[in-house]
Amino acid sequence: MAEHSTLGQNVPKSPAPPEGLFLMDGIEGLRSLPQHSVDMLLTDPPYGTTRNFWDVPLPLPELWEAVRWAVKPEGAVLFFAQCPYDKVLGASNLPMLRYEWVWYKSRCTGFLNARRAPLKRTENILVFYQKLPYYDPQFEQGKPYKKTADRGGNSPNYGKFVRSGGGSEDGLRFPGNLLTFPSVQRTVHPTQKPVELCEYFIKTYTRPGEVVADICAGSGTT
Protein backbone atom coordinates (compact mmCIF):
# COMPACT_ATOMS: atom_id res chain seq x y z
CA MET A 1 0.00 0.00 0.00
CA ALA A 2 1.13 3.58 -0.52
CA GLU A 3 2.90 5.52 2.19
CA HIS A 4 0.72 7.93 4.13
CA SER A 5 2.29 11.10 2.76
CA THR A 6 1.50 13.70 0.13
CA LEU A 7 4.76 12.97 -1.73
CA GLY A 8 5.25 16.64 -2.52
CA GLN A 9 1.72 17.31 -3.68
CA ASN A 10 -0.04 20.42 -2.52
CA VAL A 11 -3.25 19.60 -0.70
CA PRO A 12 -5.94 21.72 -2.39
CA LYS A 13 -8.34 23.77 -0.35
CA SER A 14 -11.76 22.17 -0.18
CA PRO A 15 -14.65 24.20 -1.60
CA ALA A 16 -17.73 24.86 0.45
CA PRO A 17 -19.83 21.66 0.52
CA PRO A 18 -23.25 21.69 -1.14
CA GLU A 19 -26.36 21.35 0.97
CA GLY A 20 -26.70 17.83 2.36
CA LEU A 21 -22.95 17.21 2.65
CA PHE A 22 -20.81 17.80 5.70
CA LEU A 23 -17.11 18.65 5.39
CA MET A 24 -15.66 16.77 8.35
CA ASP A 25 -13.87 13.60 9.39
CA GLY A 26 -16.07 10.69 8.28
CA ILE A 27 -15.55 8.61 11.41
CA GLU A 28 -16.32 11.59 13.62
CA GLY A 29 -19.39 12.18 11.48
CA LEU A 30 -20.69 8.70 12.27
CA ARG A 31 -19.98 9.19 15.96
CA SER A 32 -21.93 12.45 15.95
CA LEU A 33 -25.10 10.76 14.70
CA PRO A 34 -27.76 9.39 17.06
CA GLN A 35 -27.11 5.78 18.02
CA HIS A 36 -28.48 3.23 15.53
CA SER A 37 -29.93 5.95 13.29
CA VAL A 38 -28.47 4.73 9.96
CA ASP A 39 -30.21 2.03 7.91
CA MET A 40 -27.34 1.51 5.47
CA LEU A 41 -23.72 2.59 5.14
CA LEU A 42 -22.49 2.66 1.53
CA THR A 43 -19.05 4.14 0.99
CA ASP A 44 -15.96 3.99 -1.19
CA PRO A 45 -13.02 4.38 1.22
CA PRO A 46 -9.40 5.12 0.26
CA TYR A 47 -7.59 1.89 -0.66
CA GLY A 48 -4.09 3.21 0.07
CA THR A 49 -2.70 2.06 -3.28
CA THR A 50 -1.89 5.36 -5.03
CA ARG A 51 0.20 8.47 -4.41
CA ASN A 52 -2.80 10.76 -4.09
CA PHE A 53 -2.67 12.81 -0.90
CA TRP A 54 -6.19 11.69 0.04
CA ASP A 55 -5.52 7.97 -0.49
CA VAL A 56 -4.90 7.14 3.16
CA PRO A 57 -6.78 4.11 4.56
CA LEU A 58 -9.13 4.75 7.45
CA PRO A 59 -8.08 3.51 10.91
CA LEU A 60 -10.09 0.30 11.08
CA PRO A 61 -10.60 -0.12 14.86
CA GLU A 62 -11.99 3.40 15.10
CA LEU A 63 -14.04 2.88 11.94
CA TRP A 64 -15.79 -0.23 13.22
CA GLU A 65 -16.47 1.36 16.57
CA ALA A 66 -18.21 4.24 14.81
CA VAL A 67 -20.09 1.87 12.47
CA ARG A 68 -21.48 -0.15 15.36
CA TRP A 69 -22.57 3.07 17.04
CA ALA A 70 -24.37 4.70 14.10
CA VAL A 71 -25.65 1.81 11.97
CA LYS A 72 -28.60 -0.26 13.14
CA PRO A 73 -27.75 -3.88 14.06
CA GLU A 74 -29.91 -4.99 11.11
CA GLY A 75 -28.39 -2.38 8.80
CA ALA A 76 -26.20 -3.31 5.82
CA VAL A 77 -22.65 -1.95 5.64
CA LEU A 78 -21.13 -1.94 2.15
CA PHE A 79 -17.56 -0.95 1.31
CA PHE A 80 -16.01 -0.74 -2.13
CA ALA A 81 -12.56 -2.36 -2.10
CA GLN A 82 -9.88 -3.87 -4.31
CA CYS A 83 -6.86 -6.11 -3.74
CA PRO A 84 -4.94 -5.87 -1.45
CA TYR A 85 -7.15 -3.52 0.56
CA ASP A 86 -10.21 -5.79 0.35
CA LYS A 87 -8.29 -8.52 2.21
CA VAL A 88 -7.24 -6.14 4.98
CA LEU A 89 -10.72 -4.68 5.31
CA GLY A 90 -12.48 -8.05 5.34
CA ALA A 91 -10.09 -9.57 7.89
CA SER A 92 -10.55 -6.57 10.18
CA ASN A 93 -14.11 -7.66 11.02
CA LEU A 94 -14.69 -11.32 10.17
CA PRO A 95 -17.67 -11.67 12.56
CA MET A 96 -19.62 -9.11 10.47
CA LEU A 97 -18.27 -10.02 7.01
CA ARG A 98 -20.96 -11.93 5.07
CA TYR A 99 -20.28 -11.93 1.33
CA GLU A 100 -19.19 -9.74 -1.56
CA TRP A 101 -20.48 -8.31 -4.79
CA VAL A 102 -18.19 -7.97 -7.80
CA TRP A 103 -18.49 -5.00 -10.12
CA TYR A 104 -17.42 -5.82 -13.70
CA LYS A 105 -16.31 -2.52 -15.22
CA SER A 106 -16.53 -1.46 -18.84
CA ARG A 107 -13.02 0.01 -18.68
CA CYS A 108 -9.89 -1.54 -17.21
CA THR A 109 -7.39 0.23 -14.97
CA GLY A 110 -3.76 -0.44 -14.16
CA PHE A 111 -2.28 0.12 -17.62
CA LEU A 112 1.08 1.24 -16.22
CA ASN A 113 1.56 -2.26 -14.80
CA ALA A 114 0.14 -4.12 -17.81
CA ARG A 115 3.43 -5.95 -18.47
CA ARG A 116 3.71 -7.06 -14.86
CA ALA A 117 0.12 -7.84 -13.85
CA PRO A 118 -3.30 -8.27 -15.46
CA LEU A 119 -5.40 -5.18 -15.97
CA LYS A 120 -7.97 -4.56 -13.27
CA ARG A 121 -11.45 -5.15 -14.65
CA THR A 122 -13.34 -5.69 -11.39
CA GLU A 123 -13.81 -4.17 -7.96
CA ASN A 124 -15.31 -5.81 -4.91
CA ILE A 125 -18.04 -4.54 -2.65
CA LEU A 126 -17.83 -6.20 0.77
CA VAL A 127 -21.07 -6.65 2.69
CA PHE A 128 -21.05 -6.57 6.49
CA TYR A 129 -23.86 -6.71 9.01
CA GLN A 130 -24.63 -7.82 12.57
CA LYS A 131 -28.18 -9.07 11.98
CA LEU A 132 -29.84 -10.02 8.71
CA PRO A 133 -30.74 -6.75 6.92
CA TYR A 134 -33.63 -5.91 4.64
CA TYR A 135 -32.91 -7.48 1.25
CA ASP A 136 -34.88 -6.78 -1.91
CA PRO A 137 -33.22 -8.72 -4.76
CA GLN A 138 -33.20 -6.79 -8.03
CA PHE A 139 -34.44 -9.50 -10.37
CA GLU A 140 -32.90 -9.95 -13.79
CA GLN A 141 -35.01 -10.65 -16.85
CA GLY A 142 -34.50 -13.95 -18.66
CA LYS A 143 -36.51 -16.39 -20.72
CA PRO A 144 -39.66 -17.87 -19.13
CA TYR A 145 -38.99 -21.25 -17.56
CA LYS A 146 -40.62 -23.95 -15.49
CA LYS A 147 -39.41 -24.65 -11.99
CA THR A 148 -38.65 -28.17 -10.86
CA ALA A 149 -41.21 -30.13 -8.88
CA ASP A 150 -41.09 -30.27 -5.11
CA ARG A 151 -38.32 -32.52 -3.95
CA GLY A 152 -35.88 -32.83 -1.11
CA GLY A 153 -32.35 -33.97 -0.66
CA ASN A 154 -29.33 -34.06 1.58
CA SER A 155 -26.34 -31.89 0.77
CA PRO A 156 -22.93 -32.52 2.38
CA ASN A 157 -22.52 -28.76 2.66
CA TYR A 158 -25.93 -27.76 4.03
CA GLY A 159 -27.64 -30.93 5.26
CA LYS A 160 -31.27 -31.74 4.51
CA PHE A 161 -33.25 -29.41 2.28
CA VAL A 162 -36.59 -29.15 0.48
CA ARG A 163 -36.78 -27.51 -2.95
CA SER A 164 -40.19 -26.03 -3.68
CA GLY A 165 -41.66 -26.35 -7.15
CA GLY A 166 -44.05 -24.33 -9.25
CA GLY A 167 -44.15 -22.56 -12.57
CA SER A 168 -42.85 -19.24 -13.84
CA GLU A 169 -44.15 -17.27 -16.80
CA ASP A 170 -42.09 -14.09 -16.45
CA GLY A 171 -38.57 -15.51 -16.58
CA LEU A 172 -37.29 -13.39 -13.70
CA ARG A 173 -34.05 -14.61 -12.15
CA PHE A 174 -32.50 -13.90 -8.78
CA PRO A 175 -29.35 -11.81 -9.23
CA GLY A 176 -25.88 -13.28 -9.04
CA ASN A 177 -23.10 -11.42 -7.27
CA LEU A 178 -21.43 -10.29 -10.53
CA LEU A 179 -22.81 -6.92 -11.60
CA THR A 180 -22.03 -5.24 -14.92
CA PHE A 181 -22.29 -1.46 -14.96
CA PRO A 182 -20.42 0.93 -17.27
CA SER A 183 -17.58 2.94 -15.81
CA VAL A 184 -18.07 6.69 -15.47
CA GLN A 185 -16.79 8.39 -18.63
CA ARG A 186 -16.34 11.96 -17.40
CA THR A 187 -15.34 11.94 -13.77
CA VAL A 188 -14.91 14.68 -11.19
CA HIS A 189 -13.02 12.28 -8.91
CA PRO A 190 -10.35 9.72 -9.93
CA THR A 191 -12.17 6.76 -8.34
CA GLN A 192 -15.74 7.84 -9.06
CA LYS A 193 -18.35 5.07 -9.05
CA PRO A 194 -21.44 4.90 -11.29
CA VAL A 195 -24.64 6.38 -9.90
CA GLU A 196 -26.55 3.37 -11.27
CA LEU A 197 -24.41 0.94 -9.27
CA CYS A 198 -24.90 2.81 -6.00
CA GLU A 199 -28.61 3.09 -6.75
CA TYR A 200 -28.73 -0.69 -7.26
CA PHE A 201 -27.32 -1.31 -3.78
CA ILE A 202 -29.56 1.26 -2.12
CA LYS A 203 -32.65 -0.33 -3.69
CA THR A 204 -31.43 -3.76 -2.59
CA TYR A 205 -30.81 -2.97 1.07
CA THR A 206 -33.18 -0.12 1.99
CA ARG A 207 -36.81 0.88 1.76
CA PRO A 208 -37.90 4.30 0.47
CA GLY A 209 -37.33 7.01 3.07
CA GLU A 210 -34.65 5.18 5.05
CA VAL A 211 -31.30 6.71 5.96
CA VAL A 212 -28.19 5.96 3.88
CA ALA A 213 -24.81 7.31 5.02
CA ASP A 214 -21.60 7.78 3.03
CA ILE A 215 -18.54 8.82 5.02
CA CYS A 216 -16.17 9.10 2.02
CA ALA A 217 -18.16 11.25 -0.37
CA GLY A 218 -15.58 11.79 -3.13
CA SER A 219 -17.70 12.99 -6.04
CA GLY A 220 -20.89 12.72 -3.98
CA THR A 221 -22.33 9.87 -6.05
CA THR A 222 -24.20 8.27 -3.15
Q: Language-model features: where?
A:
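Core catalytic lobe of class I
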Residues: 2-222
